[in-house]
């Protein structure tokens, strides 16, 4: 039964506003347990006998069975949904039973028992479940099971291959009749499952689980006869196990010998070398977690190996308690645990950078474990040479500050370390405290490394060494440290390889909660972090970009976010329209926004950026510098302007994708929807408080379609939205209506969105609609290259600026390394090089122009434009002309400035026309 809330909302509205959608458009009508009536009916007369038999087999209580049958009736009655699957009633019945059991918190069966009853695999089950609108509780249960399955599947495949490399399948010695490779595999896998459940609170941590599995493998190699082992494990095991001629059966292993076996690390060192694992981390897991577990297990047979039956009985207890997957079935290659043949989890590939002079290398498939290990190894290469303490260069920067920040920085790092260690242990397991300490040390190394790179970049840009304000800013340091830790945490998890929502419990925004850091403050450091750390992998850059998107779409809009205070201050200072970015949305987002700009703005403002084009005239430069230091108006926030511009681009990109799927027959509506969408974000930003960007997008689309008489139901919008790669069902099922009250997105549209924007929406039905907002320029990838150069269409030509040509000397801007003309630097036919290379190329181009002009005219070459030399009073001109009187010199410079400005303005106008024409196309 659909909810009645939309009807009540519609009845309260006057006739003029656009009509609300009918009740059947509610996309959440079958998503929650509260929407299904539980009236006592004679279900035995309605339900099919096979359904009743299935429920009896699974021992499903009557009220769960009734709920499951109602869910089935609703699923089977929806037009188009699960088309082709309705005939497979048994599978869908099982899914409906699962939904009802989860919603009612009554699960009398395990997930594997349900699978066996309906004869389906994990992936087939979840593929069908995704097609049904379910509650958030069911979504979470499904996500948890799927993540656990993925990790177990990857680990078992890895263990199976590892055992094949360690053990001989047909050993020549007769001593191994009681101990063979299959027996060791079974014992190792079940022991690992028990250890994982005992040691780790997180079920989906792939790296620590794999390290624990290596400990299990090491332990049972020590108890295996050398005749069963391959090299190099056989050589490493002989000093422990004795001569290969020594019979193993019946050996009396004293406590002293057992202790020696525990403390011997030769085999585990070989394992770590073979799998490229960090030996210190694995040893820590071995001594702090695995040895205490194995000693508490207390099950040992005469030959030193635990009995399979005893281990299996213990695991049975854990499995029945958790009511999820029976991972022992991996040993039998059971069809319920078969993987999807096209599943990317099993065939992930690690990108390989090819030498352009060589033929393209064939990229070989990697397992998830191998991929994560490679990523960790790349991080280790960067940080192995780094220090846990500030370098001499950093200390030099600290000493140059008005207020030396060193003591506060060291104290902050120490205090945060204690907090991180505690939170990590709470999330992963108390036995993993030392692992948390190791991860934190890596994060601190990266923190100091990136900080030093940032300061070097700022020094080159501004020609100053006193960064007292920035280095004494607590939020800057917490954000930079959080970003470094996020890189480390993501490297050790699979979240770098998939969407954030399917990451581990330590995935973003976990680090923000640990450090009590606001998402908007964290966002400020992401771009600078990526630009200055050139060794970040492509996957890590994508991960940080996803973090940035997550912040822009929802996390920055939480009630306690500093974003709202910044918006209020900005509006109070400069009026309601100042949220528009300074540069047009149709132009690329270029410019070297640094951490100093973001964290000290608007307390400090570098030169005011009024254009993102790469060519600036001397007059423009002079005007920008003067306005930055002499304006009396309140300074705009660089961080706010850049944030809004990025939000607009993310918003339009998603809207464009949705319109392409739903409104291909009405392309003119996209621009109108965008105008309403952008107006809401700019002027009705309170609607974003504790809400999601996509909620405003879908409401904007529906409102414009209604007022333009386009038949587009809200449910169709939601169905298309669910197919977007970043979409989550909670976005449209659980929308804030008012304080602590949540409902579906259609209720939000009727009771909140339309009420606030009623007048504005109706304007689009009039003969004089509002002026359409400009379409943002969408770059292919904002972080594709660290310096974000601009590529000119039609050729392999890139234009990129050097550092800022100004330094601050006694409050006045003065040129340092560049003049206005030398900012135009071109690289042709090659990748991006150093600034010196750009300067040489630029000089060559200028000289070529002069030679061509001289040969064409047959006379003396024209004098080049003179470079303005504000820093040296009375210096000779660049062309070697003699010294002129001050008045004549001033007039000459003024003429040059006017000429240059005119030329650049014409060039800008032509470029703007080109951009506009491209956007219209």
From Swiss-Prot:
GO MF, any single term: DNA-binding transcription factor binding
InterPro entries tied to this protein: Cyclin-like_dom, Cyclin-like_sf, RB_A, RB_B, RB_C, RB_fam, RB_N
Region (Domain B): 633-764
Keyword Nucleus in record: yes
Pfam families: DUF3452 (PF11934), RB_A (PF01858), RB_B (PF01857), Rb_C (PF08934)
Region ranges (Domain A): 367-573
Region (Domain): 764-921
Residues modified to N,N-dimethylproline: 2
Positions bearing N6-methyllysine: 803, 853
UniProt main location, coarse: nucleus
Keywords noted in UniProt: Acetylation, Cell cycle, Chromatin regulator, Cytoplasm, DNA-binding, Methylation, Nucleus, Phosphoprotein, Repressor, Transcription, Transcription regulation, Tumor suppressor
Compartment annotation: Nucleus; Cytoplasm
GO biological process: aortic valve morphogenesis; apoptotic process; cell division; cell morphogenesis involved in neuron differentiation; cell population proliferation; cellular response to insulin stimulus; cellular response to xenobiotic stimulus; chondrocyte differentiation
Tissue expression remark: Expressed in the cell nuclei of renal tubules, hepatocytes and skeletal muscles. Expressed in skin (at protein level).
Coiled-coil regions listed: none
Region (Spacer): 574-632
GO cellular component terms given for this protein: chromatin lock complex; cyclin/CDK positive transcription elongation factor complex; cytoplasm; nucleoplasm; nucleus; PML body; Rb-E2F complex; spindle
In-chain residues carrying the UniProt-annotated modification Phosphoserine: 31, 243, 561, 601, 605, 617, 773, 781, 788, 800, 804, 848
Assembly and oligomerization: The hypophosphorylated form interacts with and sequesters the E2F1 transcription factor, thereby inhibiting E2F1 transcription. Interacts with heterodimeric E2F/DP transcription factor complexes containing TFDP1 and either E2F1/E2F, E2F3, E2F4 or E2F5, or TFDP2 and E2F4. Interacts (when hyperphosphorylated and hypophosphorylated) with PKP3; the interaction inhibits RB1 interaction with and repression of the transcription factor E2F1, potentially via sequestering RB1 to the cytoplasm. The unphosphorylated form interacts with EID1, ARID3B, KDM5A, SUV39H1, MJD2A/JHDM3A and THOC1.
Family annotation (PANTHER family): RETINOBLASTOMA-ASSOCIATED PROTEIN, RETINOBLASTOMA-ASSOCIATED PROTEIN RB -RELATED
Protein name per Swiss-Prot or TrEMBL: Retinoblastoma-associated protein
Organism (species): Mus musculus
Gene from which the chain derives: Rb1
């Amino acid at each position: 039964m659909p909810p009645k809330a939309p009807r009540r909302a519609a009845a309260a509205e006057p006739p003029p506003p656009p009509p609300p959608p009918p009740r059947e458009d509610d996309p959440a009508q079958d998503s929650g347990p509260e929407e299904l009536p539980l009236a006592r009916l004679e279900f035995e007369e309605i339900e099919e006998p096979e359904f009743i038999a299935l429920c009896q087999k699974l021992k499903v209580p009557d009220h769960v069975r009734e709920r499951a049958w109602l869910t089935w009736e609703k699923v089977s009655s929806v037009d188009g949904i699960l088309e082709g699957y309705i005939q497979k009633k048994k599978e869908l019945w099982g899914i409906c039973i699962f939904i009802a059991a989860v919603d009612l918190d009554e699960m009398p069966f395990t997930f594997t028992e349900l699978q066996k009853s309906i004869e389906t695999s994990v992936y087939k089950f979840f593929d069908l479940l995704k097609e049904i609108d379910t509650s958030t509780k069911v979504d979470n249960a499904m996500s948890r099971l799927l993540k656990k399955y993925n990790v177990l599947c990857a680990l078992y495949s890895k263990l199976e291959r590892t055992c094949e490399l360690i053990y001989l399948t047909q050993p020549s010695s007769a001593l191994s009749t009681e101990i063979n490779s299959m027996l060791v595999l079974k014992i190792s896998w079940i022991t690992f499952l028990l250890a994982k459940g005992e040691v780790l609170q997180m079920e989906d941590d792939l790296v620590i689980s794999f390290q624990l599995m290596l400990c299990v493998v090491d332990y049972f190699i020590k108890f295996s006869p050398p005749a069963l082992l391959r090299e190099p494990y056989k050589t490493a095991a002989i000093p422990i196990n004795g001569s290969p001629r020594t019979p193993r059966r019946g050996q009396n292993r004293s406590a002293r010998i057992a202790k020696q076996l525990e403390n011997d690390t030769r085999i585990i060192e070989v394992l770590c070398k073979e799998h490229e694992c960090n030996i210190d981390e694995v040893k820590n897991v071995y001594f702090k977690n695995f040895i205490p577990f194995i000693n508490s297990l207390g099950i040992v047979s005469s030959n030193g190996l635990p009995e399979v039956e005893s281990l299996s009985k213990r695991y049975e207890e854990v499995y029945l308690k958790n009511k999820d997957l029976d991972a022992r079935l991996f040993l039998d290659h059971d069809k319920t645990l078969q993987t999807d043949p096209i599943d990317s989890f099993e065939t992930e590939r690690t990108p390989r950078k090819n030498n352009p002079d060589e033929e393209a290398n064939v990229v070989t498939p990697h397992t998830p474990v191998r991929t994560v290990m490679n990523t960790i190894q790349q991080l280790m290469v960067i940080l192995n040479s780094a220090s846990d303490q500030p370098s001499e260069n950093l200390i030099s920067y600290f000493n140059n500050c008005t207020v030396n920040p060193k003591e506060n920085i060291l104290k902050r790092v120490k205090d945060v370390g204690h907090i991180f260690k505690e939170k990590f242990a709470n999330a992963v397991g108390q036995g993993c405290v030392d692992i948390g300490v190791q991860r934190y040390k890596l994060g601190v190394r990266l923190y100091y490394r990136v900080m030093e790179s940032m300061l070097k970049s700022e020094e080159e840009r501004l020609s100053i060494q006193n960064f007292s304000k920035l280095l004494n800013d607590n939020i800057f340091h917490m954000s930079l440290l959080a970003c470094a830790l996020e890189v480390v945490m993501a490297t050790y998890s699979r979240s770098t390889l998939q969407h954030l929502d399917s990451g581990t419990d330590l995935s973003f925004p976990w680090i923000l909660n640990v450090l009590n850091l606001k998402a908007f403050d964290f966002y400020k450091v992401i771009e600078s972090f990526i630009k200055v750390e050139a060794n970040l992998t492509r996957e890590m850059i994508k991960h940080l970009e996803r973090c940035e998107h997550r912040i822009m779409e929802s996390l920055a809009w939480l009630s306690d976010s500093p974003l709202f205070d910044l918006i209020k201050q900005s509006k109070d200072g400069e009026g309601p329209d100042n949220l528009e970015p300074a540069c047009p949305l149709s132009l690329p987002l270029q410019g070297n926004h640094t951490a100093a700009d973001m964290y000290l703005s608007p307390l400090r403002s570098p030169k005011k950026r009024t254009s993102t084009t790469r060519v600036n005239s001397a007059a423009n430069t002079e005007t920008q510098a003067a306005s930055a230091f002499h304006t009396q108006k309140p300074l705009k926030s660089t961080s706010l302007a850049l944030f809004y511009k990025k939000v607009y681009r993310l918003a339009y990109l998603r809207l464009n994708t949705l319109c392409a799927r739903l409104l291909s027959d009405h392309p003119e509506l996209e621009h109108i929807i965008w105008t309403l969408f952008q107006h809401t974000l700019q002027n009705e930003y309170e609607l974003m408080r504790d809400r999601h960007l996509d909620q405003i997008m879908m409401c904007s689309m529906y409102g414009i379609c209604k007022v333009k008489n386009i038949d587009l139901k809200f449910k169709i919008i939601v169905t298309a939205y669910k197919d977007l790669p970043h979409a989550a069902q909670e976005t449209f099922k659980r929308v804030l209506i008012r304080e602590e009250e949540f409902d579906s997105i259609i209720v939000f549209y009727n009771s909140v969105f339309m009420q606030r924007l009623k007048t504005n929406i109706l304007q689009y039905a009039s003969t004089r609609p509002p002026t359409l907002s400009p379409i943002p320029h969408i770059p292919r990838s904002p972080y594709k290259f660290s310096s974000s150069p601009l590529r000119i269409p039609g050729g392999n030509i890139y234009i990129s600026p050097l550092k800022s040509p100004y330094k601050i000397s006694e409050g006045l801007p003065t040129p340092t390394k560049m003049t206005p003309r030398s900012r135009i630097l071109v690289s042709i036919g090659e990748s991006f090089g150093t600034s010196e290379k750009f300067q040489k190329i630029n000089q060559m181009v200028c000289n070529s122009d002069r030679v061509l002009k001289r040969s064409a005219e047959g006379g003396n070459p024209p004098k080049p434009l003179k470079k303005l030399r504000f820093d040296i009073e009375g210096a000779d001109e660049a062309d070697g002309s003699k010294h002129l009187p001050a008045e004549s010199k001033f007039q000459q410079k003024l003429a040059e400035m006017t000429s240059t400005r005119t030329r650049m303005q014409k060039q800008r106008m032509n470029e703007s026309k080109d951009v506009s024409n491209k956007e219209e196309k």
